[in-house]
């Protein structure tokens, strides 16, 4: 897939040039006190890509992805592609889309067997069955600005990129997706030979949901010096993780952000993962179940310096 990209895009994916951002968003980003508004504005300001780290219970799909879609959809001509690794996550994305008002029209690419019954009316095959001519098909597909599917489903419909060019692709569960699985989509070409995907947003958590690889790390290790210079050390790593490592070196990286307020775990339960994996950045939302008194084994762990 790499050779199909322009040289500047190839340099971007290999970490040889930094991603670009629209500085006109900087003031709004600095002033907002809403975490989801902040990351949506950052995603909107990105010209190439943006990475969002979403620890457990921080609302990365139900709130952050939804807010991004609302922002992009408000721009009347924006074409949006929404991807995830599993059909269950795609169901969650569809649920988020269904909660947006006014209602957003979307088409889901995939099988009826792997789609929640609530969203089967949006399946591409069911929508096309209602069309009486190729012209109707083209009009229906052109008029819909939001497409949703698993990475595998979209990759299997390569002809979609001859009909549609997407201004942005938002990828949920991005840390579960290996680079070869994703690059075929990100490097696809539109009919006029422009990139079929203008920019991409990766949402995930490499501390929580890495890709599932059967090989051990030794067998998948990369030894080529050129690839290692590009940050590709192991074939089990996702594109998200490789790009994330690049930006960790920066003092205030524009290309990454992290949701820190979580509403799932009790502080006592969150104590260990917070310290061990998230540098103590996680904060409880203070929901009723998070305020209940429980014995906190994390205190014992802390005193004995296991962390």
Q: Model-derived features: where do they sit?
A:
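Conserved helicase motor core of SF1/SF2 NTP-dependent helicases
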Residues: 74-78, 86, 152-153, 160, ...
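Short, small-residue-biased leader/transition segments that mark boundaries at the very start
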Residues: 2-7
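Generic hydrophobic/aromatic pocket-lining and core-packing "Φ" positions
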Residues: 40, 68-69, 182-183
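Intrinsic disorder
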Residues: 30, 46, 55-58, 62, ...
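Short hydrophobic/aromatic beta-strand immediately N-terminal to the Walker A/P-loop
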Residues: 50-53, 81
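N-terminal pre-P-loop "Q-motif" helix
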Residues: 28-48, 55, 63, 149
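Conserved P-loop NTPase motor core of helicases/translocases
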Residues: 9, 15-17, 21-26, 77-169, ...
